[in-house]
Amino acid sequence: MSTLAPPKERLDRGERSGLGRAWRVIVLNDDHNTFDGVAFALSSVLPGVDFDAGMKLANRIHNSGRAIVWSGEREQAELYWEQLAGHGLTMAPLEQ
């Protein structure tokens, strides 16, 4: 007689709405924001991003032309998008 293994438990990290994929906040490279300015904006708006992590993201944005800086639920993504745009960052439209 064989026994069925219990299903593996999935942790809910709050990154998805249950209705699809997470929403992505993307910052685009531009020629008017400094690395320090981008790092400051990212560290001021995004939870868990300090200035050093903001600098790493600024480098990724510069080298790749864009970077996903946060992903998660739509309402939170919209808030972060608005706040980063308010800091003068060049933003791509939200993507899912």
Segments (PLM) and residue ranges:
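Terminal domain-initiation and capping elements
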Residues: M1-Q96
